[in-house]
Amino acid sequence: MASILSKKQKKNEKYTLKELKSLGHDLLTSRSHINNLPLLLTFVSPESPPQFVVESLLSLQSFFTPLLSQLPPTSSSPSSTKTEDPEVVFKAWLRSKFDEFVKLLLDVLVSQQSEDSLRGIVLGTLMEFVKLLNAGRFHSSIYHRLLDAIIHSEVDIEIFLDILTSKYFKYIDVRYFTYISMEKFVKTLEASVSADRTVIENNEAESDSKESLELSVRKIYQVLSQIPPPEKQAEKSQHEMWSGSDESISEKPTDKKKKTEKGDSTLLSPATISKRMKLKFTKAWISFLRLPLPIDVYKEVLASIHLTVIPHLSNPTMLCDFLTKSYDIGGVVSVMALSSLFILMTQHGLEYPFFYEKLYALLVPSVFVAKHRAKFLQLLDACLKSSMLPAYLAASFTKKLSRLSLSIPPAGSLVITALIYNLLRRNPTINHLVQEIVENADEANTEAGEHNESQPKTIKKRKLGIDYFNNQESDPKKSGALKSSLWEIDTLRHHYCPPVSRFISSLETNLTIRSKTTEMKIEDFCSGSYATIFGDEIRRRVKQVPLAFYKTVPTSLFADSDFPGWTFTIPQEEGTC
């Protein structure tokens, strides 16, 4: 193979660019120079200089374009008869050369030796053939081969996506057949994955196949995410076609007679086109989400699926299996799946009986420092907004959040306090969790029974030492939250961070006047951090300036009285007195 390529290169080196232009001109002017066609094809190669490739490409494109409607559908030789028509044989030969030309263009397109400008020209040529080859109908076969070469190439797909997005994805038939091709690629990958599971191979081969699978999955996701979503019929009544005919996305009739009877008269209404686009969009995405996604792609999909996919699906509940499986994984993945699952439950009637149990399990300290904590906390507040929430469930979430407030940063304690405040306002049945101070009741008991001082002391110790809430229990029904109290919130009154203690004090006064207070907006607290708390503190106007008066000038930063029982001496270096 290498010797053949070297011979071609040596043969091509004999021609100059001017001579190459002359060969193309002769081919276009007279049929007698048809032998220039195979010669020009030899220059369409990644090894050829870019200017030679472009010149040959332009000549061959100009030659084939007027003949596309006359070429047979395949390059197979005509049926052997006694009198073969030379014209039929000639057109079959032209078709074989055209197929060779397309194959060479695809090789140049995905070659790592090709320049980006050359790739743009080649891609434009192939898209012109897609437009013209099938007599005004979209030629899906060439387009599928084009996408297949892009998906399975080692070249960065962003180079091709920039061109496709800017020039071609605005046409509805291009998007339509892109979804069809993506679905076919996914089915091929699914078959290869199932085959790999049944065949036991060595570790190197297994790792190579896994890497190639992940690369293909990433490229398919990049293509799907770059395609504009299906447009609603009300937004745009006329759809722009690359092929210029609505028949491109019509169903193919099985009967040849019916096909000829329909002819070019079949025009689809915008509503029908929108329906079929939505159907192909749904099939492509649902089939893609069945693949084993790499973790980075998994997170990207979950972060955007509620905005880019769910609103455009023909039946959003088809995502039920994917989202419930993601929600059951736990950790960050569950947090990211919560938004989409909540949309399916509230807007599309999805029933998920273990939703609140899984949500309860997500309440761990790491959630309050996660990347998507702001969205999660807002969704948490929305999920607990119903006044029909059972008392045990509201109490369990309230108690779980209050316990978390002791072990998270101050910004998290602020948002937790706001969440608890909203829960108490929405669910009057759990107001008993906010108890009076225990010592006051005990003092009243001791005054009434001074003759028996030992018994009240025992009761006091027992009341202060028991909390029936089990923080390790994953089932809210068994947590025992209804028998507990929010002593953690009382602890926050002595928090080291002044904004937290001030916030708790303000809530104590507000809770006594429920009719004149409103729920707190959780989004106002979600973006808090050490930096925002510090910034708010230094911007506060201080009414009293704290001053320190010393009768004598201090000789050290800390006085000895600050460290009773300790003696600090400065060790002297050797050789000094």
Swiss-Prot record:
Any one Pfam family match given in the protein's UniProt record, by short name: CBF
Transmembrane segment boundaries: 329-349, 350-370, 404-424
Keywords tagged on the record: Membrane, Nucleus, Ribonucleoprotein, Ribosome biogenesis, rRNA processing, Transmembrane, Transmembrane helix
Region (Disordered): 230-263
InterPro entries the UniProt entry points to: CCAAT-binding_factor, Noc4
Sequence similarity: Belongs to the CBF/MAK21 family.
Designated name of the protein: Protein NUCLEOLAR COMPLEX ASSOCIATED 4
Native species: Arabidopsis thaliana
Encoding gene per record: NOC4
